[in-house]
Amino acid sequence: MNYYISDLHFGCQNKYENRTLEHDKIIKQNWNAKVTNGDTVYILGDIGREGGNKDNEYLCGIISTLKGKKVLVQGNHEKLNDIRIRQLFTEVCQYKEVSDNSNGKSRNLVLSHYPILMWKNQHKGWIHLYGHVHVSDEWDVYKQSLKYLNDYFKNKTLKGYIDCPPAEAYNVFCGLYDYSPVTLDEILLGN
């Protein structure tokens, strides 16, 4: 089974988002209660605080205890200068295209840390999953922009845009899903 999550920010305390070290324990507990070692988890960036050896050891310690195969789609906080961190992932990339199933139907996905306004085959049913914006004004602007784009193309008779499905994009910030990785079905049901 595939799971998706972003913006874990392990080891990063932030009073504005009520992020403490307790936050790290909650993510770990929720993750390991849901994910098996046979599952794949796509982490769409911002795994946590890197830097000094102490920070890196903490990050390695917590990530190594998370079940499943972990694929990292890099975010703006990833330096990955420490090989110990990089080795915890089966793959590290900037952008990823995958197929997944939802309600028995195969769906193509575009994965990125950043929200993209125009992505591959967006009006042919491809879904975009992203992070970075958490719950913010930037997220509101992105959602409004995507709505405008869908409304614009809904009434167009341009070649290739007749009867095309609306573009679908979903924020997989962990705070939106009780600090737990989620399946594509859970994402689609929750939106």
Please report, for each region that a protein language model flagged, where it lies by residue.
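N-terminal active-site segment of His-dependent metallophosphoesterases
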Residues: 1-57, 165-176, 191
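Catalytic metal-binding/acid-base residues of hydrolase active sites
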Residues: 9, 47-48, 76-79, 115-116, ...
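Metal-dependent catalytic neighborhoods of phosphoester/phosphodiester hydrolases
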Residues: 15-16, 45-65, 74, 79-92, ...
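A general structural motif
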Residues: 38, 67-69, 106, 124-125
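Conserved beta-sheet core of the metallophosphoesterase superfamily
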Residues: 86-191
